[in-house]
């Protein structure tokens, strides 16, 4: 109802920390897709829409950095698509996350094997240096569950200054991007039967 817009929704915060050795960086290309049509070296005018009324998808590349001697070298690989998100006013990375609400089964140790009650999908996400591992304790955790802070990273802050740009986005070493529960699509619907 209009008075209870979150009724029946399990709202969630999602964090994406960079606990690696180098920046996580994406760079957009000038390759766009509208339905089954691919447009190369395309520079769409402001407000451009596909024939079906949707926004075009823009191919992105992920840059991976390596230190060779005293210089950085990088390689690029295809990494999915960006799409314009009208309620936020900028481009996001498509298909960032899938959230599932599951029924606990005490006879099954692997939680991914528990029955799915419902799911939600985050159709887009922006990569940005929103906070630090020290500023968001508990969001940066290593593979054995140790909580990491800024001092845990010898390359802390490497790169830096990423924002939600239309060409380059990223997360610096020791930084965290957080997608708040108050934003679009940050929920899983709880079925009436549950």
Features from the language model and the residues they span:
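Solvent-exposed loop and beta-edge segments used for protein-protein assembly and interaction
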Residues: 4-8, 91-93, 184-190
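Short coil-to-beta strand junction motifs in C2/discoidin
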Residues: 26-97, 120
């Amino acid at each position: 109802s209009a008075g209870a817009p979150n009724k029946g929704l399990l709202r969630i915060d999602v964090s994406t920390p960079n606990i690696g050795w180098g920046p996580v960086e994406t760079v957009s290309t000038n390759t766009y897709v509208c339905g089954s049509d691919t447009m190369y070296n395309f520079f769409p005018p402001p407000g451009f829409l596909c024939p079906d009324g949707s926004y075009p998808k823009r191919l992105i590349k992920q840059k991976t950095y390596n230190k060779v001697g005293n210089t950085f070298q990088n390689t690029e690989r295809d990494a999915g698509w960006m799409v314009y998100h009208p309620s936020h006013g900028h481009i996001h990375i498509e298909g960032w996350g899938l959230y599932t609400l599951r029924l606990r089964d005490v006879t099954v140790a692997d939680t991914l094997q528990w029955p799915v009650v419902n799911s939600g999908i985050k159709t887009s996400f922006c990569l940005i240096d929103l906070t630090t591992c020290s500023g968001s304790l508990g969001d940066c955790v290593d593979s054995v569950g140790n909580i990491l802070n800024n001092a845990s990273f010898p390359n802390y802050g490497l790169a830096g200054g990423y924002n939600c740009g239309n060409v380059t986005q990223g997360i610096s070493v020791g930084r965290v991007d957080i997608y708040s529960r108050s934003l679009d699509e940050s929920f899983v619907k709880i079925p009436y039967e549950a």
